[in-house]
Every structure is written in C-alpha cells, then in structure tokens.
C-alpha cells in the first residue's frame, strides 16, 4: 500500500497535473489517500512528484 499526501498547492500547475491530482482524489493540501502499489499509480505519482509526499 502507498500513502500519498498533497503537500504543495495545485495553483500554477498545468492542466494535466491538475487532472492527475483529481484522478488520485487529492484536492486539498494535507489530504491523504491510500492506494494499491501498482504501475498505474506509480506513473500518476511520477507526474506530480513535486507536489506530493509518498510513504510506503
């Protein structure tokens, strides 16, 4: 399981990064979600790695 926490603001991000955060379900700063560890989620995290904090 992977825990993903939004730590930086979405303001100023490009639209693709915003859609990725929406798909991850991260809308507010300090919001956390837990996901299964798979390639799809890893790829989404890689797109917004500068905005999130990941713990395994």
UniProtKB/Swiss-Prot annotation:
Keywords: Ribonucleoprotein, Ribosomal protein. This is Large ribosomal subunit protein uL30. It holds the Pfam family Ribosomal_L30. NCBIfam families: rpmD_bact. One of its GO terms (molecular function) is structural constituent of ribosome. Belongs to the universal ribosomal protein uL30 family. Part of the 50S ribosomal subunit. One of its GO terms (cellular component) is large ribosomal subunit. GO terms for biological process: translation. InterPro entries: Ribo_uL30_ferredoxin-like_sf, Ribosomal_uL30_bac-type, Ribosomal_uL30_ferredoxin-like.
